[in-house]
């Protein structure tokens, strides 16, 4: 491509020329925005264009328009300009998923993961600009659809306004786009009492939350992996049910809530719980590699948008308007799309081959396939629709590293060919003709059904991928998975932490929730003023109105080192444990982790360093390192459990991990350690089996107490008995054989195990 020479040597003019001449050729046309030439959508495009270009107003009062003239917005206009979705380079899979969500808001939601700067938020906000406006009932708090009176919120029938021709008064508004902030409270999310209106009317008045505003629009959650666990569970429960039922503070109210959920997150800042991702239909990654040309085009179009956004709007105006029309028509055609039973069997078999748990994947995949057909203006699902649905829904949920079930449903074998016999010549000719016609009809039907199902599966019978090009995509999806829950990483209390929600007090109120207290008292202000004789008080709050604050704070972990201080290698083990403890304390300032050291020697164990986060205290306590004597391993583990339980009661510890640095050999019973006077001097020495059974019993109690055990075996491999590994097995903990481990190795091993524990 030749560039026109520039007379001026100014770098600004050179950049402008490069941008205007080169970028339109480098910027690929988005595949998902190209309409098929042959279907009903193309013929109806101009009919619906008028509806897509209507000037509307959002529920928040912000004027918005989707007309052609509005795309040429002056760069000096006040307000934020959102990057158009059609101008995003690459990410065709994510843009296709967003278009599917725009067609069917109840598709199940879309989750986009990716590192910083991968256009996750840009694409989510860009979708809002191509959504067509919606018609709502005037006075509705949840964008009620006039065509669906069964889904209206409570009391809307009493607030309906009518036109002169006795029809319900409606208005056209822009599809809402509601973002959930990370610090959102429960009352702001689901709704609460409107204090001002309740005081005026003398009765409880409901104030809608963000879920009511998002109905029939887009509900966007940025950094969903950092959202409070209780809020995320509440959010997904409401979206799954499609209705928000509020029963609190004297309120009994319900309203529909069926928005399109779009969630984005950065896996480097924390994984998302697998349970949460399973309830989202499409999970895609924005970290897929881009070609050099695409990266150049992306930087160029972003630079052009920052300087002259109106040029970018004009450049993608046709694609944007086409997408708006495509969404409107596809919503109508979706009602007529059918998917056959054989196609459902194909989706189920793909899910079984991929090792997908549950049935949500098949349900979501069937809905995605129907949306793909509706976008193309078809009434039947095709092979391409099925394969695309598997790639978008089932593939990210697959477990490629797991062994699939031994017995899987296989397609039925083809019927055997008819056999010729001499007796056939004696049959009636009419019957033969009828049978031949029936067979030909069945063959035609079978051929038609086979044409609607892919000939090859994406997953083979052993659970592997047939197409190696999809392997990277599946691996990216598996990296995004988190664990089942992280409830113990947060501590709830009434005195310290971040205010998350109000609650009825249990005893004396430590922290008064003023907002919730006023909401509870608001409906009774009018009645209480009438009973007040003095007339001097402005606000009347009684004891029954009191609400306490429910606080939450980050929970630290407690690492308890149980060190064998007996034998000739005791000093080395104690020195390594001391170094590992100091290293962990130096790194635990932000994580609030605590460290404790319990050496066991002689006849009993002692708490040399109680749970602490102070490095100075640890240095002072660990100056004296006692060594030598017997090996009371059972008492050392029992003491660690007692220290852990006491730390849990203090309310500062969420997770507890016991790190046992030992060779697994013990020669002192627990009874001798706890009550030495009860043992007679001439009592026989305990057998090895008795000592081992006692230690294994303590290991089982560690697991039942909810604590994690990490065993670092220091036994010489030439005389190893393997009992240390048995201890870890009974406690369902981790085992490492590190006979000559340094403090750095022990601290690194403990840190990795602690990280896995926090994410479990």
Swiss-Prot record:
Residues 423-453 have a biased composition (Acidic residues). Its main location: plastid. Pathway: Porphyrin-containing compound metabolism; chlorophyll biosynthesis. Residues 56-76, 397-453 are annotated as: Disordered. Belongs to the Mg-chelatase subunits D/I family. Pfam families: AAA_lid_2, Mg_chelatase, VWA_2. Residues 410-419 have a biased composition (Pro residues). It catalyses: protoporphyrin IX + Mg(2+) + ATP + H2O = Mg-protoporphyrin IX + ADP + phosphate + 3 H(+). Induction: Not regulated by light. Coiled coil: none annotated. It is an enzyme of class 6 (ligase). It comes from Arabidopsis thaliana (Mouse-ear cress). Gene3D superfamilies: Magnesium chelatase subunit I, C-Terminal domain, P-loop containing nucleotide triphosphate hydrolases, von Willebrand factor, type A domain. GO terms for molecular function: ATP binding; ATP hydrolysis activity; magnesium chelatase activity. The magnesium chelatase complex is a heterotrimer consisting of subunits CHLI, CHLD and CHLH. Interacts with CHLI1 and CHLH. One of its GO terms (cellular component) is chloroplast thylakoid. This is Magnesium-chelatase subunit ChlD, chloroplastic.
